[in-house]
Curated annotation (Swiss-Prot):
The gene coding this protein: Tmprss9
Protein name, UniProt field: Transmembrane protease serine 9
Residues carrying a glycan: 469, 549, 640, 665, 791
Matching Gene3D superfamilies: Low-density Lipoprotein Receptor, Trypsin-like serine proteases
Transmembrane segments: 32-52
Cytoplasmic face of the membrane: 3-31
Domain notes: The serine protease 1 and 2 domains are catalytically active, whereas the serine protease 3 domain lacks the essential Ser residue of the catalytic triad at position 1011 and is predicted to be inactive.
Native organism: Rattus norvegicus (Rat)
Stated family: Belongs to the peptidase S1 family.
Length: 1061
């Protein structure tokens, strides 16, 4: 009998970035193939939970995508679409299937295909726009009768939370979120934990930032014979969690002591306490060779006195989900550099990002187990190191509590690129940890408190092991508060930082330092500050539309470059407004579409005190719980109109939309976003309107998530701040910014556009910053972009001298009579172009990675020097991996010269996110052999090429967008576009180090694989000069998106200072 068609009901909850669970050993493995249109890379899909009621059978499936075939745009891993769309679609998809009997594999494949499509269409995603998935694999399939045991606590299916009364809660991470989900309240029963009274951005441990007293009150220094050896985390009054490998050699508890309540290794603070270790329990399955199950539980001889500086971190439930890309904190006293074996005196802190398990496993040769989790960044620079072992990896949840996600375990080197830190995954070992702590028969009521550390107090020792007194700096220790003999050591709030003053308000926030929020602007009417604004371009600010309900534009000025309302310090700038455009759908009654675009009367000159914030893509996701920064000069207290002289800042968490909608009686629209804390205390207030809600998406790079709009009161409990959601308004913003700036009409929308009676004073265009408002979507290289700094200076040699910077109007290599000479050739078209002949472009170089394949272009500018694009070397920065191929237009030729690259120098101001200063010098191991096939190009003078100049681009890149590489050098003629025209196509990304070339109608362009190649223009003398280096662009040959090139004239000084013959 054919089984009845199943009833497919996609469950509405979607959880981002959840890794695929590992199936039980009894599960079978089967592969099914399906074709699903979707826009995602290496996407992990979730659990199919099938409850077949008629047979009383429970079937679980685990599905994983394979064989993704991308469109050309998504092939660029450094594009905005790839970088932002991919994690946006990393979702756990739930399907509820009902059938009369188990399904066949063919039926499962059909259900899987339909279910995925239904779920993604439900999220409003276009399924056919970006690529095709060619196969899906069922990695697990387990079935059996649903027994009573399966429904008891700890046996809920999938990632469902198990209540003590056996209720299963399917909501992600319901424990300690300040909302009772279990009918017996057990999900909120043990939640004296995780509060963060103050938030500060973290630096690094390797080269890191110092932690403040009380900032990490769960951090412990484990001392082996008085020397700091490992870190540990407080999880209870008498219990610590650390790494098992810390005790490979020293397993006797008598050799160990714990120091808590101090950020100084010396324990010089009066808050420092110490306790002897009574017992060390390593996991029974710990493997010293593989570092699997690398966890240990330590029992202290005396309970710790919880207080302002000593608090436990929260243990997550076994079902707790820490999604990839979540920002978490590490801390420790480990080495600051891999090769600098000196530990810091002060506790170091860092922010790291959780990485996808499959990705990290591939980086480590698939040696990871399910008990491990990776955190860090692919480009390195931020990591734990030796001496940090056993310390905490803690993640803050929307409730404001910190949960222990991992224990510092191992890694290759410290902060190396593509070698993130590996941590013991606490959720997989939580049950064992609780088993150890609950099996102890020692009393939990303290008989005496651990002594505070003072100069006269010896370390606690056993009778068998006496040690001398400590030599801490003398301090006056206050008398500790007495503990009643019958009172257990109880945390005030587990995970709290009572010693840290939480930035309790821009209502009462903390002062920002100069340059900390360089995109913040103050809008003043006369001398009165009335609203904030945010810099998004050299001529553009964003603010709230309601700020201009009753404002005379001619009286408004924007003040920037300083944190002082009085204009003291920094680099203060005061500019008038040329126009204000309110969103055409702005509703002053409900404050929907509450955004305004302000055009400045003059362009800004960017510096370290004035910078734009990045605008997110429309598909950018700011996940619930993400910590973001608000800033402004608004009221410091509700009802108190006193404004601070110094800019205030605070950290707030993104709040789930449905929850916030319920708090505001469902009056929110999709153009609104909530941020703050349910308990209140942190909020924007009157006078902050129009200011930024900025989120740090990658280290040091902030994106504008919202604009301060409205709220009920200021910092009230359960009344968070409401912000205009930028992702929903981005299209209008860009359209408004791309209108003709010389127009005085209403060129872009029907919005209210106010024009002042006085015409603006025109000045020279200002510099564009090193961090712009948007990441270019397509680089011209075929290499993924990550950051790895390289040396940018050369040590002087006794036998050579540096070349002097050329005088204005001269050419660096004008002394080379044959530079820039080439046989005359027809200027045709690289995308849709024609092949170059032998010797036609003798300065063109192909850069080969590992001597296997062409990856980038380069240009010969001297006998042993090449110029290329800096982004070509973001991942592969070792010159030993590169070789230069010259003297032939054929990649498969055996005739050309192959030269080894000795050194790579990227411009010191190169910015990986904006591609500003995207240029690199390559020094060859030896001089090239000049001939009619190999000769350098001339470097230009300092002036810009004239608009409309006809120049040539060459390279072996793709012949069409998404196509294959050319095997013979291609050439194309393009027109140089004016800076104003270029900015109209790319309103916020263009800096003065960039120029555009191509045609408005498209059709002719450089493409992937051409990066680093030349944009060459012919002088009247017949010599060719290097005007630009191929850098980036949107797609290839698209209308209205010309190619963007690094302007060589803008970096002549740097080139001249570094090149020597």
């Amino acid at each position: 009998m054919e089984p009845a068609a199943p009833d497919l009901q996609p469950v509405p909850e979607v959880t981002k970035g959840v890794p695929v669970p590992t199936p039980d050993s009894g599960c079978c493995r089967a592969a099914v193939t399906t074709v699903v249109a979707i826009s995602v890379a290496s996407l992990t899909l979730g659990v199919l939970s099938a409850f077949l009621s008629a047979q009383g059978v429970q079937v679980e499936h685990t599905a994983q995508l394979h064989g993704v075939r991308f469109t050309s745009l998504l092939q660029q891993e450094n594009s905005d679409f790839y970088r932002l769309l991919t994690p946006a679609l990393q979702t756990l998809l739930h399907f509820l299937l009902r059938a009369l009997q188990p399904l066949s594999l063919d039926q499962e494949a059909d259900i899987l295909q339909k279910g995925i499509q239904a779920r993604l269409q439900g999220q409003g995603l276009s399924l056919a726009a970006y690529g095709t998935i060619t196969s899906v694999e069922l990695t697990g399939r387990c079935e059996g009768p649903v027994t009573e045991r399966d429904l008891k606590s700890g046996h809920c299916p999938g990632n469902a939370f198990s209540c003590q009364n056996s209720q299963c809660v399917s909501k992600e991470n319901p424990e300690c979120d300040d909302r009772v989900d279990c009918s017996d309240g057990s999900d909120e029963a043990q939640c004296d934990c995780g509060w963060q009274p103050a938030w500060r951005s973290a630096g690094r441990i390797v080269g890191g930032a110092e932690a403040a007293p009380g900032e990490f009150p769960w951090q412990v220094s484990l001392r082996e014979n008085h020397e700091h050896f490992c870190g540990a985390t407080i999880i209870g009054a008498r219990w610590l969690v650390s790494a098992a490998h810390c005790f490979n050699e020293f397993q006797d508890p008598a050799q160990w002591a714990a120091q808590a309540g101090s950020v100084h290794l010396s324990g010089s603070e009066a808050s420092a306490v110490r306790a002897r270790v009574l017992r060390i329990a390593k996991h029974p399955a710990y493997n010293a060779d593989t570092a699997d199950f690398d966890v240990a539980v330590l029992e202290l001889a005396r309970p710790l006195p919880f207080g302002r500086y000593v608090q436990p971190a929260c243990l997550p439930a076994a079902t707790h989900v820490f999604p990839p890309r979540k920002k978490c904190l590490i801390s420790g006293w480990g080495y600051l550099k891999e090769d600098f074996l000196v530990k810091p005196e002060v506790l170091q802190k860092a922010t790291v990002e959780l990485l996808d398990q499959n990705l990290c496993s591939s980086l480590y040769g698939h040696s990871l187990t399910d008990r491990m989790v990776c955190a860090g960044y692919l480009d390195g620079k931020v990591d734990s190191c030796q001496g940090d072992s056993g310390g905490p990896l803690v993640c803050e949840e929307p409730s404001g509590r910190f949960f222990l996600a991992g224990v510092v375990s191992w890694g290759i080197g410290c902060a190396e690129a593509r070698r993130p830190g590996v941590y013991t995954r606490v959720t997989r070992l939580r049950d064992w940890i609780l088993e150890v702590t609950s099996s102890a028969d020692t009393p939990v009521v303290p008989t005496e408190a651990p002594a505070p550390i003072t100069p006269s107090t010896p370390w606690p020792t056993s009778p068998e092991s006496r040690v001398p007194n400590t030599t801490a700096k003398p301090t006056v220790a206050p008398t500790p508060a007495p503990l009643h003999p019958s009172t257990a050591a109880k945390p005030q709030e587990c995970g709290a930082r009572p010693a840290m003053d939480k930035p309790t308000r821009i209502v009462g926030g903390i002062s920002a330092v100069s340059g900390e929020v360089p995109w913040q602007a103050s809008l003043k009417e006369g001398s009165r500050h009335f609203c904030g604004a945010t810099v998004v371009g050299d001529r553009w600010l964003l603010s709230a539309a309601h700020c201009f309900n009753h404002t005379k534009l001619e009286q408004v000025q924007a003040h920037l470059g300083t944190v002082s309302l009085l204009g003291v310090g920094g680099s203060p700038v005061k500019l008038g407004l040329r126009s204000v455009a309110l969103h055409p759908r702005y509703n002053p009654g409900i404050l929907d579409f509450d955004v305004a675009l302000l055009e400045l009367a003059q362009p800004l000159v960017f510096n370290k005190y004035i910078q734009p914030v990045c605008l997110p893509l429309a598909i950018h996701k700011f996940p619930v719980g993400r910590k973001c920064m608000i800033s402004g000069w608004g009221n410091m207290q509700e009802g108190n109109a006193t404004k601070p002289d110094i800019l205030q800042k605070a950290s707030v968490g993104i709040i789930e939309q449905k929850m916030c909608g319920a708090l505001y009686n469902f009056s929110l629209t999709d153009r609104m976003l909530c941020a703050g804390f349910l308990e209140g205390r942190v909020d924007s207030c009157q006078g902050d309107s129009g200011g930024p809600l900025a989120c740090e998406e990658t280290p040091g790079v902030f994106y504008l998530a919202g604009i301060v709009s409205w709220g009920i009161g200021c910092a009230q409990a359960k009344k968070p701040g409401v912000y205009a959601r930028i992702t929903r308004l981005k299209d209008w913003i860009l359209k408004a910014m791309s209108s003709d700036p010389s127009s005085t009409a209403h060129p872009h929308t029907s919005s209210t556009r106010l024009i002042p009676s006085q015409p603006p004073t025109t000045t020279a265009a200002g510099l564009i910053p090193e961090a712009s408002t948007g990441r270019p979507a397509t680089l011209r290289a075929t290499i993924r972009v990550t950051t790895r700094p390289l040396n940018t200076t050369l040590s002087a040699r006794s036998t050579t001298t540096r070349r002097q910077t050329p005088a204005p109007g001269t050419t660096v290599f004008s002394h080379l009579p044959d530079c820039g000479l080439a046989p005359p050739g027809a200027l045709t078209r690289i995308v849709g172009g024609s092949a170059a002949s032998l010797g036609e472009w003798p300065w063109q170089v192909s850069l080969w990675l590992r001597r296997r394949e062409h990856r980038c272009g380069a240009v010969l500018v001297a006998e042993r020097w090449l110029l290329s694009a800096a982004h070509c070397f973001d991942v592969y920065g070792d010159p030993m991996q590169w070789a230069a191929f010259l003297g032939t237009p054929f990649l498969s030729s055996t005739e050309g010269q192959l030269e080894r690259v000795a050194r790579i120098y990227r411009h010191p101001f190169y910015n990986i996110y904006t591609l500003d200063y995207d240029v690199a010098l390559l020094e060859l191991a030896g001089p090239v052999r000049r001939s009619r096939l190999v000769r350098p190009i001339c470097l230009p003078g300092p002036t810009r090429p004239p608009e409309g100049a006809r120049c040539v681009i060459t390279g072996w890149g793709s012949l069409r967008e998404g196509g294959s590489m050319a095997r013979q050098l291609q050439k194309a003629a393009v027109r140089v576009l004016s800076e104003q025209t270029c900015r109209r196509f790319y309103p916020v990304q263009i800096s003065s180090r960039m120029l555009c070339a191509g045609f408005p109608q498209g059709g002719v362009d450089s493409c992937s694989g051409d990066a680093g190649g030349p944009l060459a223009c012919r002088e009247p003398s017949g010599q060719w000069v290097l005007t630009g280096v191929t850098s980036w662009g949107y797609g290839c040959g698209r209308p209205h998106f010309p190619g963007v090139y690094t302007r060589v004239a803008a970096v002549l000084g740097w080139i001249g200072q570094n090149i020597r013959e």
